[in-house]
A protein has these predicted regions:
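Active-site hotspot residues in diverse enzymes, especially metal/ion-binding acidic/histidine motifs
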Residues: 1-267
Length: 267
């Protein structure tokens, strides 16, 4: 990652931390979970919460491996589409990122997988969404405690500390590094450049070397579109019976869903 861009991320975090933290607490209150507890299954938590906001979450393997998720709203319904062709850690972060857009955002976005895209960081809302995701998935009290534990187990080695934290919280390498810098657990000026340029191959190898679960770098390629389509159709039939919508509206919703699905799949 470009060092100057990293400085901007940390500067944004320092300036907006309290505001974003209040959003994390509001989201946790909405879902009925403790805001300082570790999230073991982010998708399980958000699926029902999103439905209360009239958003459906479904997983599809995209042809574009640079997009983590899409947030789209139309026809009275919203869709969060998660790219399952990516490693599990990226999917987890993308889901948490989309929580911000659904609950607090003003725009629709295609969430990028990496932190190093210039266009991505032209939007302040994307800084906010990433800060939100980091705070939600790596709660401060827990993160500080586990950082000390894993640093001790790693004999002070920064890379191994980050890899262990990454495995524990099931989040991307760069997200962990940024969280460490946000909380001033590491001094960015004193860190070697190689720490900022660790690629997926190196991460997987280090996970193996440390006897950690390498599968967090695998893609599930899950495709549950047909399941979501059935849910939407069932709800649509109920709304037609209650005279909230008509047959034409339901057909339009299903048609738009199918078009979005085909576009994402590249078919």
């Amino acid at each position: 990652m470009n060092v100057e861009r990293l400085r901007k991320i940390i500067a944004y975090s320092n300036k907006n931390r309290e505001e974003i933290y209040s959003m994390v607490k509001r989201f946790c209150s909405f879902t009925g979970i403790e805001y300082d507890s570790d999230l073991l299954n982010i998708l399980q938590i958000v699926r029902s919460s999103f439905q209360k906001k009239d958003y459906f979450v479904f997983e599809i393997p995209f042809t574009d491996d640079e997009i983590g998720a899409l947030c789209y709203r139309g026809d009275g319904l919203g869709y969060v589409v998660v790219n399952t062709s990516l490693p599990k850690v990226n999917v987890n972060f993308a889901i948490a990122h989309e929580i911000y857009h659904v609950f607090f955002g003003e725009n629709e976005f295609a969430s990028k997988v990496e932190f190093a895209d210039d266009h991505y960081y032209k939007h302040e809302e994307e800084y906010a969404a990433n800060l939100f995701a980091g705070m939600l998935l790596m709660p401060e009290v827990s993160f500080r405690r586990m950082y000390l534990k894993f640093r001790d187990e790693s004999s002070g080695n920064e890379v191994d500390t980050i890899i262990r934290l990454m495995s524990y919280y099931q989040v991307p390498y760069m997200a962990v590094l940024i969280r460490c810098l946000e909380l001033e657990l590491m001094d960015g000026k004193a860190l070697p450049e190689q720490l900022f340029n660790f690629d997926r191959v190196q991460i997987r190898q280090r996970l193996a070397d440390l006897w950690l679960d390498e599968s967090i770098m695998d893609a599930s390629n899950r495709d549950d579109y047909s399941h979501i389509e059935k849910i939407v159709e069932r709800l649509g039939r109920k709304y037609i019976g209650d005279e909230y919508i008509n047959e034409r509206t339901l057909k339009k919703v299903l048609h738009n869903m199918r078009e979005l699905y085909m576009k994402i799949k590249g078919e």
